[in-house]
Amino acid sequence: MCGASSGGSISYYWRMTNSELPNSAAGYFGSMAESYDSLIHRAVPRYDEMIARLLDYLPDNPWRVLELGCGTGNLSLQLVKAFPRAELTLVDASSEMIALVRSRVDGSLSGSASSVSYIQARFEDLDLPVQSFDLVVSSISLHHVADKGSLYARIRSLMSPRGRFCFADQIRGEPESNHARNWERWLDFCRERGHCTSEEIESLLQHAAAHDHYTTLTEHTALLSKTGFSEIDCVWRNWMWGIVTSTAS
């Protein structure tokens, strides 16, 4: 959830061996599926605002929607409400998260024409038909993928022409001094206001050291452009978190 790439600002705050860490991001989030909602609201400043702003920039009537990293369904539930006639495909690497989001989303479908399918898979392993989706969306998940160029190329292949790719995620600050400052502000937010326990903060930092890969906005923009996206914009930003929107060329 909260992290930095290897060798970055995370080294200021935490060092430990990989043998002591969860062996995958899916394993980490699977182990905390039931407590995830509480923690994300306490550990991510302005979380609800970020989700609301992401929804603001989605197209009006997409028919086929892919969500990458659906987690417990915080964004998924909003997608069902916003697009009641759409075909939704929700993807997460954690079986525990898929089970939880299925129970929440299926329970919200009464009276809705939405069709929802669920896939347990890593983003890199998705096997879906090309040009299958009008909208691809994600929230605080893409930073778990190291090779974003390959990921963006794969996402582009799944999208119909003029489809929209919009995501909220953690973005590496630039210059490096800004990245470090963002980390300091986040840690102050968690510690001084008592939003997270010391054990929760340590767990987040451990996860970050093992599994998170930050990308700057400049790098995101270049990779998206190179892999077939245009109209790229950062429409919201708060410390480490930001929202990026783009269109399949």
Can you name each region flagged by the protein language model?
Residues 66-68, 72-125:
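Class I SAM-dependent methyltransferase SAM/SAH-binding core
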Residues 223, 227-249:
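Core SAM-dependent methyltransferase catalytic element
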Residues 12-35, 186:
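N-terminal, positively charged/glycine-rich alpha-helical extensions of SAM-dependent methyltransferases
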Residues 128-135:
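A short acidic, Gly/Pro-enriched loop at the edge of an enzyme's catalytic core
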Residues 140-141:
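Short catalytic micro-motifs in class I SAM-dependent methyltransferases
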Residues 168-227, 233:
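C-terminal alpha-helical "lid/dimerization" subdomain adjacent to the S-adenosyl-L-methionine
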Residues 45-63:
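Conserved alpha-helix/loop element of class I SAM-dependent methyltransferases that forms part
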Residues 150-161:
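A short glycine-rich, Lys/Arg-flanked "PGG" loop and its adjoining helix->strand segment in the class I
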